Design a protein with these regions (language model features):
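Acidic, glycine/proline-rich Ca2+-coordinating loop motifs
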Residues: 1-241
Length: 241
């Protein structure tokens, strides 16, 4: 399974020209860009781009170089990111005038889900990925608070929004008109492919041969054994602290 990379197109009076490579945007085949936010991160008046990537590819923070190009400075701004970043939103959450960042992931909400889904790397794999150039990525939502000095700090656990299970899009806006931005997270997946019981079932040699045969009936039969996991959406009210 491979992604298609990210693409940037320049508007030329109603016509678009791809400038991905010349602008410094990464377009790797392992990129699964599921979220993008365009905003002025560093306060210089120029729009920057944050891309949240699912699976192994890290997230990217492209800082506008004011000449039609961008530079990835994610490692300079963030100590770590979500492992499988899905949705992302950049909004001021504490009314200090600086943009903050929220990304969604798939950390289960309860102990049962935590123990029945395969959501984490073992330490050996984690270390090997760091040595291979991957970044510090953890299976959890991240709420990156802007420290106003070119750095962000993740306060998701402190704020109670680190775990919302299999989450996709996130929207941060003032839901109750009190002047403070609140958080909405949409959740759920039709078939839970991270279920460890299904993983053991799928590892059976007979089942693997059925899938590799390429016959639709065989594949459908396997997919029917993936459990469904309905999950509620989540809404968090900003307590202003």
């Amino acid at each position: 399974l491979k992604g298609g990379g990210d693409h940037l197109y320049k508007n030329n009076n109603g016509y678009f020209t791809e400038v991905t490579t010349s602008a410094g945007i990464h377009g790797g085949l392992i990129s699964f860009g599921l979220g993008v936010s365009v905003t002025d991160i560093n306060g210089d008046g120029w729009p920057d781009v944050f891309v949240s990537n699912d699976s192994y590819e890290r997230d990217y923070l492209y800082i506008n170089q004011k000449n039609g190009t961008f530079k990835d400075e994610m490692e300079s701004w963030f100590q770590h990111t979500s492992f499988s970043s899905m949705g992302a939103d950049v909004v001021d959450i504490n009314n200090d005038g600086y943009p903050d960042l929220f990304t969604t992931d798939m950390l289960p909400l309860n102990d049962y889900r935590l123990k029945t889904t395969g959501s984490f790397d073992n330490i050996s794999l984690f270390t090997d990925k760091l040595k291979s150039g991957f970044y510090y990525q953890y299976t959890k939502n991240c709420l990156q608070l802007n420290n106003k000095n070119g750095k962000f700090i993740d306060i998701a656990r402190y704020s109670g929004v680190a775990a919302t299970d299999w989450s996709w899009g996130a929207l941060i806006f003032d839901m109750d008109n009190d002047g403070w931005n609140d958080l909405y997270v949409c959740n759920g997946v039709n078939r839970d492919v991270t279920n460890l019981d299904f993983t053991d079932f799928f590892a059976d040699e007979v089942n693997q041969k059925m899938v590799l045969s390429g016959e639709k009936k065989s594949v459908d039969k396997i997919l029917q054994n993936i459990p469904r996991t309905p999950l509620p959406n989540k809404v968090y009210r900003n307590d202003k602290d």
